[in-house]
């Protein structure tokens, strides 16, 4: 007998811990889950339950990620924590765990370290919109001035990467004390303050169904007597029969009208985010549409060829290249449903990129693709994945 239906009455938000190795990300993750479970229900987690993160695959890349859930009075959170630095890089670039906000953990005893900076930069590049800071290990620092200094350094670092340093909530505490059940200011109280900061500082994300209509084209059929049907999975928004849509990417943008929505051989009056549908397009010929284009609300997304991106290059062990690549390397870029050839320009100080590296690059595609900042892609050579990336900034 089922124990009743899962009621999701609270809005859902995805978060994750970022920060330097050994600054206390996993301890904090355990502390949040444990403290909040006593207040709002949910499951307490021990450190080693989170640290033994299972492997998962995203875009052919193996990533170790721990998933923890917890609730506050207002929200349900899904929280990701990664054991190793390389896992963070892969996770953020592939979007395996898309974050609505990140919790930056920084040790008060050490201050910002190289990975603190690198994770903030990655968060900026991959479009993590909000960061909340937990200044950890405050029980090891007696000097108030030292705490203020570390706090100031963190705010400056956030500013440097275009996060609002002055407005960012910084909570002081000790994840270790909280996990041990300490009820003091640095223990449980700090975790409750952090939970409040997450609730108030990170806005509730827009649900996919509330977005502007977008559907990547997977297949195109000609049905005699009815016209052209385009199939795919609606990525966001809603499409209603009779609405005007645009076909964007690869060639010149065209306008058409959706005259029918089909799902499982039934006619519907609309399709929405998550649905696998066939859309009947008025006056559109079979050869006017191809896989790799998108159908969208007119004016909502534009085709582009020139952009900067943050990419992770697969190591040899992950089935990637065995050799480095150099400036002007020309692989295929797999966006949504299709490959497009493009040329890579490396930063001036980078002569080559080794398998296992992550790097900021500039790309020029030979055909335009419907593109927005934050769009994920794979880098492929002859059909096998050699890298993963995310569009950081559109140039043209």
Swiss-Prot record:
Sequence positions that bind Mg(2+): 26
PROSITE patterns assigned: G_TR_1, G_TR_2
Residues reported to bind GTP: 19-26, 81-85, 136-139
Keywords for the protein's UniProt record, in alphabetical order: Cytoplasm, Elongation factor, GTP-binding, Hydrolase, Magnesium, Metal-binding, Nucleotide-binding, Protein biosynthesis
GO MF, one example: translation elongation factor activity
InterPro entries: EF-Tu_GTP-bd (IPR041709), EF-Tu_GTPase (IPR050055), EFTu-like_2 (IPR004161), EFTU_2 (IPR033720), G_TR_CS (IPR031157), P-loop_NTPase (IPR027417), Small_GTP-bd (IPR005225), T_Tr_GTP-bd_dom (IPR000795)
Catalyzed chemical reaction(s): GTP + H2O = GDP + phosphate + H(+)
Region (G1): 19-26
Gene Ontology cellular component terms for the protein in this record: cytosol
Start and end residues of each stretch annotated as G3: 81-84
Annotated region described as G5, given as residue ranges: 174-176
Record's subcellular location: Cytoplasm
Region (G4): 136-139
Function: GTP hydrolase that promotes the GTP-dependent binding of aminoacyl-tRNA to the A-site of ribosomes during protein biosynthesis.
Complexes and interactors: Monomer.
Entry similarity comment: Belongs to the TRAFAC class translation factor GTPase superfamily. Classic translation factor GTPase family. EF-Tu/EF-1A subfamily.
Protein's recorded name: Elongation factor Tu
